[in-house]
Structures are given as C-alpha cells and as structure tokens.
C-alpha cells in the first residue's frame, strides 16, 4: 500500500465521487457516501482502501480481501465479498490508474530531492546560462555556458548540464545525470544516473584502434521518459533521436545514430547498436539486443532476451536467438523438445510472424 511518509494523497473521496471520476457504476447506490482514503492491492487493502480486480489468477485475493471497494468487470462482480462495495467498469486497471493519478499527483513526476523551490546556493551556474522563472536547481548541480532551461524544470543534485544544452519546460533531470551535446523537448523525465550525449563507440583499425570523431547530437522530443542508469550516445555524422512519447526503462544502452520513433516502449537492459531504426509504437522486452543498421518496423514487438540480427517488418512479433517470427520460434522449440524425448514428427512449417485472422 502507499506510504504517507513519502506520498501525500488528496483528501478522502466518497464512492460516488470515485464512480464519477472513473466512469464506473456503483452497483449499490446507497453506499455513495461511503468514504475511501487510499489505494492498495487487494491482499493488503483495508476497509478504507480502493482496489481493483482484472486477472483470474488472483481471484483468491479478491475473495479474501478486506478492501472497502473494488473496481471490477461485470463478469467477476459475483466473486466480490459482501462487505466490499462494487464499482462496475469495463477496464478496472484503467479506472484504478485514473483514480491513482488523481490522488497522487506528487508521484507522477520527481521533484526536488531537497524540497527546494529555487536555485541552491551550492549549485554552479555559468553567467551565460539562461534559466526561465520557476526552474529548480538542487545542491551541487553544475550548469555550463549557454545552457537554456525552460520554466518548471528541475535539475537534481550533482547533475551536470554541459555547454550549449537546451532543455525545455517542465522537465526533470535526476541526480548525478550528465547531459551534453543535446537538445531536449518539454515534459521530459530523465531519472538519476543517466548519461546523455557522450561520444559513440566507433573506431577504425589501422595497426591500432583509432577513434572516429562523433560530431552529431542527441535529440529528445517531448514527453519522453528515460530510466535510471540509461546511456544515450550522440550521433557520429547525424543525430541520435528519441521520438515523442517514448518510454525507456532502466539501464538501456542507445548507440550513436540510433533513431527511435514515437511512443515506443523499451524495457530494462536492452542494447541498441549504432545506426539502427525503431519505427513508431515498437515494444522491446527486457534484455533485447539489436544489431546495427537494422530496421524494426512500426508496431513490431520483440520478446524479452531476444537477439535481433535482421530487420523486422511492421506489426510482427519476433523472438528468440536469433530472433524470428514468434510462432515459428515456438514451433521449433516444441520440435526440439520432441527430439530430446525421442519423439517423431515432421518439422513445423515456417511462419511469417503475422497473426492469423480469427474472424
């Protein structure tokens, strides 16, 4: 359940107010004045908490919960204990998130780790840097020459913003993050310990390894979120680009000249080699590695721990080592298991990776 030590929720809500906010139907309208003061998982919830149920795997938690109210689909509302108020809704998780965002705005984005409202005395800011009103700079942060930072942005403790970097409005740069050779849009969240804009890993071998100059930039568009420990190399001759609305998890490596489209999701510990391209709405599971110079088409999905050496067409699902269409990969796994058990049978036919029409 949520901790009031770190997160300060809004005042309590009635079930009628929650129903209106989440567009749910309160099955027993007579309970409309019943008060809820927080959110919790069903197994930890008490009489003042709101929970939600959507996955049949956790039906035992639903049947044993002590929650005061539960968001649930009509299909499962008969499994809700009598003491729990039922809020009927088409998508319980979406309704729950809507209410959570409403009462916990303080958890939506990092703020100053020191409760600061201005520039800390120990911060170092070059005289030529331009900070709009409302920028917060925590202790020991360093802001270099000709840096521009928009209103409402927060620069965490020990962060280093190098010469010429531009950061838009309502951004957050986490503690001990370094940013150089970068242009960053509005409402970008960069969590602690990230390194953005260092030179890419490019050498040629002529008796010794000779470094290739990296003279591009990093372009991060609006509404991007980058998790802790992620590194984004600047481009060599062209820019490294992260598209609008993309969300990147912790400890991801983005190589030089990479182009990531809009609204992609990249899970932890992925490695994106130089000069590859992700289209829009691409999803990568954890620990995916992608070869350089390949193209992952719009809407493609790659399963966790896959190694991708070839381009993936738009809309397809690939996985494995080396990655291939997932249904082909699964059939090959089954065939190998049968061989290990001494079974017989023809090898499965190849698959194009496209979902079959079930209509």
From Swiss-Prot:
The keyword Protease does not apply. GO terms for cellular component: membrane. Pathway: Bacterial outer membrane biogenesis; LPS lipid A biosynthesis. It is an enzyme of class 2 (transferase). It catalyses: a UDP-3-O-[(3R)-3-hydroxyacyl]-alpha-D-glucosamine + a (3R)-hydroxyacyl-[ACP] = a UDP-2-N,3-O-bis[(3R)-3-hydroxyacyl]-alpha-D-glucosamine + holo-[ACP] + H(+). The keyword Transmembrane helix does not apply. Keywords: Acyltransferase, Lipid A biosynthesis, Lipid biosynthesis, Lipid metabolism, Repeat, Transferase. The active site is at 256 (proton acceptor). GO terms for biological process: lipid A biosynthetic process. Its EC number is 2.3.1.191. GO terms for molecular function: N-acyltransferase activity. Homotrimer. Belongs to the transferase hexapeptide repeat family. LpxD subfamily. Catalyzes the N-acylation of UDP-3-O-acylglucosamine using 3-hydroxyacyl-ACP as the acyl donor. Is involved in the biosynthesis of lipid A, a phosphorylated glycolipid that anchors the lipopolysaccharide to the outer membrane of the cell. PANTHER family: UDP-3-O-ACYLGLUCOSAMINE N-ACYLTRANSFERASE, UDP-3-O-ACYLGLUCOSAMINE N-ACYLTRANSFERASE 1, MITOCHONDRIAL-RELATED. This is UDP-3-O-acylglucosamine N-acyltransferase. It comes from Rhodopseudomonas palustris (strain HaA2).
């Amino acid at each position: 359940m949520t901790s009031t030590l770190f997160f300060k929720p809004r005042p309590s809500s009635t079930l009628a107010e929650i129903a209106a906010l989440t567009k749910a139907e309160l099955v027993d309208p007579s309970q409309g004045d019943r008060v809820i003061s927080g959110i919790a998982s069903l197994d930890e919830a008490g009489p003042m908490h709101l929970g939600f149920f959507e996955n049949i795997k956790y039906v035992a938690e639903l049947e044993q919960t002590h929650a005061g109210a539960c968001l649930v689909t009509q299909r499962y509302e008969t499994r809700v204990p009598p003491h729990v108020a039922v809020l009927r809704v088409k998508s319980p998780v979406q309704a729950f998130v809507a209410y959570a965002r409403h009462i916990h705005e303080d958890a939506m984005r990092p703020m100053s780790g020191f409760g600061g409202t201005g520039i800390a005395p120990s911060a170092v800011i070059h005289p030529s840097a331009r900070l709009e009103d409302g920028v917060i700079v925590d202790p020991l942060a360093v802001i270099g020459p000709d840096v521009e930072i928009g209103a409402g942005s927060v620069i965490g403790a020990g962060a280093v913003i190098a010469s010429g970097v531009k950061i838009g409005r309502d951004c957050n740069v986490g503690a001990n993050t370094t940013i150089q050779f970068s242009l960053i849009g509005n409402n970008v969240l960069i969590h602690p310990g990230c390194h953005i804009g260092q030179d890419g890993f490019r050498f040629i071998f002529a008796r010794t390894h000779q470094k290739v100059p990296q003279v591009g930039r990093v372009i991060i568009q609006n509404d991007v979120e980058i998790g802790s420990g992620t590194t984004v190399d600047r481009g060599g001759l062209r820019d490294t680009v992260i598209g609008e609305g993309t969300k990147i998890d912790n400890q991801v490596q983005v190589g030089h000249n990479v182009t990531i489209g809009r609204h992609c999701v990249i899970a932890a510990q992925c490695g994106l080699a130089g000069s590859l391209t992700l289209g829009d709405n691409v999803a990568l599971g954890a620990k995916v590695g992608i070869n350089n110079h390949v193209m992952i088409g719009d809407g493609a999905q790659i399963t966790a721990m896959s190694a991708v050496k070839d381009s993936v067409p738009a809309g397809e699902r690939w996985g494995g080592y080396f990655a291939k269409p997932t249904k082909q990969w699964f059939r090959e796994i089954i065939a190998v298991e049968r061989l290990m058990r001494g079974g017989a049978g023809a090898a499965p036919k190849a698959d194009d990776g496209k979902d079959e029409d079930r209509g």
